[in-house]
Curated annotation (Swiss-Prot):
Source species: Pan troglodytes
Disulphide bridges: C183-C197, C247-C248
Signal peptide: 1-26
Localization (cell): Synaptic cell membrane; Cell membrane
Membrane topology category: Multi-pass membrane protein
Listed name of the protein: Neuronal acetylcholine receptor subunit alpha-2
Family to which this protein belongs: Belongs to the ligand-gated ion channel (TC 1.A.9) family. Acetylcholine receptor (TC 1.A.9.1) subfamily. Alpha-2/CHRNA2 sub-subfamily.
Length: 529
């Protein structure tokens, strides 16, 4: 008989199994002869078993009895048309990570599987009342349940733990596994987001006519779940599905578990949201700083630089995806535009603040709106001008006769009186003497009836020195009036700058408030806060 003969090969395999399973000693003579591969399984006669054997020997005999001629590659059904019903359940031990960038969820789970194998039945009374036995899973038939939406790593179970056999033929197998499943991450409401990640389990090669799945429980077992510091499992339910794929004509069953997980936002609130709100508040305070303060533009630039550095630091925190813009990303972009606009507006306000009549002319609409109605709407009350500015300068410097009389030099006054008397006798006015009326008008060289009329009206005749002095006084008065007018216009420009600052102060407060509400309101309405 050649080595290629099937009978010889079968005999060789049985001999090897017998040598491996037979303990040392002379037990071979007490064992029943090996069965042929085609013989049906039958329990040995109780009379052939030693009655006083130990539990270890009994378990050893049971092991040999079960796997004598057992084929682990064939489905455990009496007829090929029968269906193996696999009861499937899932228990999660830990939610390890949710990778937003690579769109996958890493979990540590236990796959609970249970089916019936008619070839692994025995009568407990024949084997010392042993009702269950634990055997290596590599020695029995196991369903090829895999994770359909696997993203990285092994699709099937890699750690082949032992299976638990029962005398009724029921096989219970709970292997642990670490899976990286694909998950469509939606970071629209980050960091107040809620994700729906699914895990789809099913047989890879057997269709529904060969293996059918049945759920042990409708929900995922969370009894042994270790709480995550970043995510909380809101709900985890399983559904049974049957689907026909394009590759095959058969229908394949699967059990899909949907994990509703919610991100815990405390870390991002402390390290992301609150700093953004504080930077926005600093931007608002820029418009409350007086324009004559030299640190106004410095504060704007400092806020912008701090925001830029802050954005560089949090690039690793924000999910790096281009599918959608996270809500916090929109808020950061809004804050950046907010600060940039504040710098532009501050430069414009400083330009308005330092305007003068020599460089700019204030338009009438600016004077009517920004100096008239707008301050009243903003509840701004401009203080009235000082009291001395309300009276013209020439009223205080009125060159009346009595005023001049009290200030003219006594010697000069005597000379003037002598000249008046001397020329009055002749009926003339002194030619070298001018006159000053009580209204401040200077007349020089008046004579004849006109001079007499002027004297009757109370005019004072002045010398050339007094004439020059009064001209100087008038020049100074005109110059002071011009300076007062220029100063008034400058103050108007400064007040216009203050009004513009106040307008943007309220505008930025409203925009900052609405932006903050826009950050928290959508996830609040969606029930994520």
């Amino acid at each position: 008989m050649g080595p290629s003969c099937p009978v010889f090969l079968s005999f060789t395999k049985l001999s090897l199994w017998w040598l491996l399973l037979t303990p040392a000693g002379g037990e071979e003579a007490k064992r029943p002869p090996p069965r042929a591969p085609g013989d049906p399984l039958s329990s040995p006669s109780p009379t052939a078993l030693p009655q006083g054997g130990s539990h270890t020997e009994t378990e050893d005999r049971l092991f040999k009895h079960l796997f004598r001629g057992y084929n682990r590659w064939a489905r455990p059904v009496p007829n090929t048309s029968d269906v193996v019903i696999v009861r499937f359940g899932l228990s999660i031990a830990q939610l390890i990570d949710v990778d937003e960038k690579n769109q996958m969820m890493t979990t540590n789970v236990w796959l609970k599987q249970e089916w019936s194998d008619y070839k692994l039945r025995w009568n407990p009374a024949d084997f010392g009342n042993i009702t269950s036995l634990r055997v290596p899973s590599e020695m029995i038939w196991i369903p090829d349940i895999v994770l359909y939406n696997n993203a990285d790593g092994e699709f099937a179970v890699t750690h082949m733990t032992k299976a638990h056999l029962f005398s009724t033929g029921t096989v219970h197998w709970v292997p642990p596994a670490i899976y990286k499943s694909s998950c469509s991450i939606d970071v629209t409401f980050f960091p107040f987001d809620q994700q729906n990640c699914k895990m789809k389990f099913g047989s890879w090669t057997y269709d529904k006519a060969k293996i059918d799945l049945e759920q042990m429980e409708q929900t995922v077992d969370l009894k042994d779940y270790w709480e995550s510091g970043e995510w909380a499992i809101v709900n985890a339910t399983g559904t049974y599905n049957s689907k026909k794929y394009d590759c095959c004509a058969e229908i394949y069953p699967d059990v899909t578990y949907a994990f509703i997980i919610r991100r815990l936002p405390l870390f991002y609130t402390i390290n992301l949201i609150i700093p953004c709100l504080l930077i926005s508040c600093l931007t608002v305070l820029v418009f409350y700083l007086p324009s004559n303060c030299g640190e106004k533009i410095t504060l704007c630039i400092s806020v912008l630089l701090s925001l830029t550095v802050f954005l560089l630091l949090i690039t690793e925190i924000i999910p790096s995806t281009s599918l959608v813009i996270p809500l916090i990303g929109e808020y950061l972009l809004f804050t950046m535009i907010f600060v940039t606009l504040s710098i532009v507006i501050t430069v414009f306000v400083l330009n308005v603040h330092h305007r003068s009549p020599s460089t700019h002319t204030m338009p009438h609409w600016v004077r009517g709106t920004l100096l008239g109605c707008v301050p009243r709407w903003l509840l701004m009350n401009r203080p009235p001008p000082p009291l001395e500015l309300c009276h013209p300068l020439h009223l205080k410097l009125s060159p009346s006769y009595h005023w001049l009389e009290s200030n003219v030099d006594a010697e000069e006054r005597e000379v003037v009186v002598e000249e008046e008397d001397r020329w009055a006798c002749a009926g003339h006015v002194a030619p070298s003497v001018g006159t000053l009326c009580s209204h401040g008008h200077l007349h020089s060289g008046a004579s004849g009836p006109k001079a007499e009329a002027l004297l009757q009206e109370g005019e004072l005749l002045l010398s050339p020195h007094m004439q020059k002095a009064l001209e100087g006084v008038h020049y100074i008065a005109d110059h002071l009036r011009s300076e007062d007018a220029d100063s008034s216009v400058k103050e108007d420009w400064k007040y216009v700058a203050m009004v513009i600052d106040r307008i943007f102060l309220w505008l930025f407060i409203i925009v900052c408030f609405l932006g903050t509400i826009g950050l928290f309101l959508p996830p609040f309405l969606a029930g994520m806060i």
